[in-house]
């Protein structure tokens, strides 16, 4: 195991910036380990840390991280997506498709 201090040049576009949000509990310790492992392996990644706690307001987190989603909850669908998945998986022996109906929306 060799210890390099200068990461090798990346093949596609140089060093990538990755946002890391350690959170609460075990998160900070795990993220420290991830960052140390990535630095030891000379992975071309630069970590940008964003501090978020469980006490933070959801809207504040989404606004500060520029996260927006257009989510439409629907209980019933026509099954087209599932049928397309099954059609794609059918001729391929290595791809398996299964269906599970979940109803957790109010």
UniProtKB/Swiss-Prot annotation:
Record carries keyword Mitochondrion: yes
Activation/inhibition comment: The heterotetramer and the heterodimer composed of IDH3A and IDH3G subunits can be allosterically activated by citrate (CIT) or/and ADP, and the two activators can act independently or synergistically. The heterodimer composed of IDH3A and IDH3B subunits cannot be allosterically regulated and the allosteric regulation of the heterotetramer is through the IDH3G subunit and not the IDH3B subunit.
Top-level taxonomic group: Eukaryota
Gene Ontology molecular function, alphabetical: enzyme activator activity; isocitrate dehydrogenase (NAD+) activity; magnesium ion binding
A GO biological process held by the record: tricarboxylic acid cycle
Keyword Hydrolase: no
GO cellular component, one term: mitochondrion
Keyword entries, A-Z: Mitochondrion, Tricarboxylic acid cycle
Subcellular location: Mitochondrion
Family: Belongs to the isocitrate and isopropylmalate dehydrogenases family.
Assembly: Heterooligomer of subunits alpha (IDH3A), beta (IDH3B), and gamma (IDH3G) in the apparent ratio of 2:1:1. The heterodimer containing one IDH3A and one IDH3B subunit and the heterodimer containing one IDH3A and one IDH3G subunit assemble into a heterotetramer (which contains two subunits of IDH3A, one of IDH3B and one of IDH3G) and further into the heterooctamer.
Functional note: Regulatory subunit which plays a role in the allosteric regulation of the enzyme catalyzing the decarboxylation of isocitrate (ICT) into alpha-ketoglutarate. The heterodimer composed of the alpha (IDH3A) and beta (IDH3B) subunits and the heterodimer composed of the alpha (IDH3A) and gamma (IDH3G) subunits, have considerable basal activity but the full activity of the heterotetramer (containing two subunits of IDH3A, one of IDH3B and one of IDH3G) requires the assembly and cooperative function of both heterodimers.
The protein, known as: Isocitrate dehydrogenase [NAD] subunit gamma, mitochondrial
Originating organism: Sus scrofa (Pig)
């Amino acid at each position: 195991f060799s210890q390099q201090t200068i990461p090798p040049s990346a093949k596609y576009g140089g060093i990538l910036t990755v946002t890391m949000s350690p959170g609460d509990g075990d998160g900070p310790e795990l993220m420290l380990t991830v960052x140390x492992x990535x630095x030891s392996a000379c992975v071309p990644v630069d970590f940008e840390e964003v501090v978020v706690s469980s006490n933070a307001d959801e809207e504040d987190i989404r606004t500060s991280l520029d996260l927006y989603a257009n989510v439409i909850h629907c209980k019933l669908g026509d099954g087209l997506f599932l049928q397309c998945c099954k059609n794609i998986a059918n001729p391929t022996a290595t791809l398996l498709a299964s269906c599970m109906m979940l109803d957790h929306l109010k």
